[in-house]
UniProtKB/Swiss-Prot annotation:
Transit peptide (residue range): 1-54
Subunit details: Heterohexadecamer of 8 large and 8 small subunits.
Protein localization: Plastid, Chloroplast
Organism: Raphanus sativus (Radish)
InterPro entries the record matches: RuBisCO_ssu, RuBisCO_ssu_dom, RuBisCO_ssu_N, RuBisCO_ssu_sf
Pfam family, one: RuBisCO_small
Database matches in SUPFAM superfamilies: RuBisCO, small subunit
One GO MF term attached to the UniProt entry: ribulose-bisphosphate carboxylase activity
GO annotations of cellular component type: chloroplast
Protein name: Ribulose bisphosphate carboxylase small subunit, chloroplastic
Keywords in alphabetical order: Calvin cycle, Carbon dioxide fixation, Chloroplast, Photorespiration, Photosynthesis, Plastid, Transit peptide
Amino acid sequence: MASSMLSSAAVVTSQLQATMVAPFTGLKSSAAFPVTRKTNTDITSIASNGGRVSCMKVWPPIGKKKFETLSYLPDLSDVELAKEVDYLLRNKWIPCVEFELEHGFVYREHGSTPGYYDGRYWTMWKLPLFGCTDSAQVLKEVQECKKEYPNALIRIIGFDNNRQVQCISFIAYKPPSFTDA
């Protein structure tokens, strides 16, 4: 008796659900959307490297250890570092200075699978610079870290506290004793 009641209730529910779904009416007309077209003067869509396009040559990756963003480029000057820090401040990211004394790159000492102790996590220099608005403050912290640990690799990261992610990371200082190979 109980099984017959359940089956009849299930039939009634499925009929009710079938009538509640609206039929598919198709896609909306594209006339309501604005149309954007490239002008003929845009040479970025040309497949060849002709014209006035100037490409920057990067450092060869062969025999070089890969670090972070911009790692294949030559070392950044203080002016270039300030521009990078200004970029992360403009994006409302929180700058943080980190350093590493032994390895500045990903390495696997105790196995082939990635883990916590494979060089991804560096030591934080002080606390993140919450409320920082000037790149000179960040570069001052880099100089203090360099003075305290002259043989350490130093990097600057930009942390987005809304999305809870690290958005940018680049090497700010390599010690003279460090070799890329």
